[in-house]
From Swiss-Prot:
Keywords tagged on the record: Cytoplasm, Elongation factor, Protein biosynthesis
Keyword Cytoplasm: yes
Function as written in the Swiss-Prot or TrEMBL entry: Involved in peptide bond synthesis. Stimulates efficient translation and peptide-bond synthesis on native or reconstituted 70S ribosomes in vitro. Probably functions indirectly by altering the affinity of the ribosome for aminoacyl-tRNA, thus increasing their reactivity as acceptors for peptidyl transferase.
Family statement: Belongs to the elongation factor P family.
Subcellular location field: Cytoplasm
Keyword presence, Cell division: no
Pathway given in the UniProt record: Protein biosynthesis; polypeptide chain elongation
Protein's name in the database: Elongation factor P
Organism: Thermoanaerobacter pseudethanolicus (strain ATCC 33223 / 39E) (Clostridium thermohydrosulfuricum)
Length: 185
């Protein structure tokens, strides 16, 4: 059991028979009245985001989430196929289950797929990925006095802000939690 006052981003709970992940939360202490916790919850099966308010002492059952290492195989235009690295079982997932992660995933990359009661609901890429820049504007000397950034498209199609010295063909390391450039590899 977890109290609403202990919510953190990423915590998965059961509310009214459905499973939600806490996307955002805020402890509110009004001048008058009791404190409360305002949350944004994402339904893990449907992807719908709702806002709910709870008392900080209200308790919820934590949902048991199974995590499995799986290899991303390919996309057939509609579904994304992943293979369990231990059993070699393949599972297809539609776009709404992979939408946040797919911009950082290349074919054959190993990712974490989350399951609830045997059904896959989310894909988590590695925390740091190395991808090649396929399109960016050339950076010129003297463009700026204090550094700066420019947009760059990587091989998966994601657009990342990178320093001016990054060129097409460079491999860069990206933090998938924030989508930020970390370093040139």
């Amino acid at each position: 059991m977890i109290a609403a006052g202990d919510f953190r981003k990423g915590v998965t709970i059961e509310v009214d028979g459905q499973v939600f992940t806490v996307v955002d939360f805020m402890h509110v202490k009004p001048g008058k009245g009791a404190a409360f916790v305002r949350t944004k919850l994402k339904n893990v099966m449907t992807g719908a985001v709702i806002e709910k308010t709870f008392s900080p002492t209200e308790k919820f059952e934590e949902a048991v989430i199974e995590r499995r290492e799986m290899q991303y195989l390919y996309n057939d235009g509609e579904l994304y196929y992943f293979m369990d690295t231990e059993t070699y079982e393949q599972i297809p997932l539609n776009y709404d289950k992979v939408e946040d992660a797919i911009k950082y995933i290349k074919e054959n990359m190993v990712v974490t797929v989350k399951f609830y009661k045997g059904e896959a609901f989310s894909v988590e890429p590695p925390t740091f990925v190395e991808l090649e820049v396929v399109e960016t504007e050339p950076g010129f000397r003297g463009d700026t006095a204090t550094g700066g950034s420019k947009p760059a498209t990587v091989e998966t199609g994601a657009v990342i802000q990178v320093p001016l010295f990054i060129n097409v063909g460079d491999k860069i390391r990206i933090d998938t939690r924030t989508g930020e450039y970390l370093e040139r590899v």
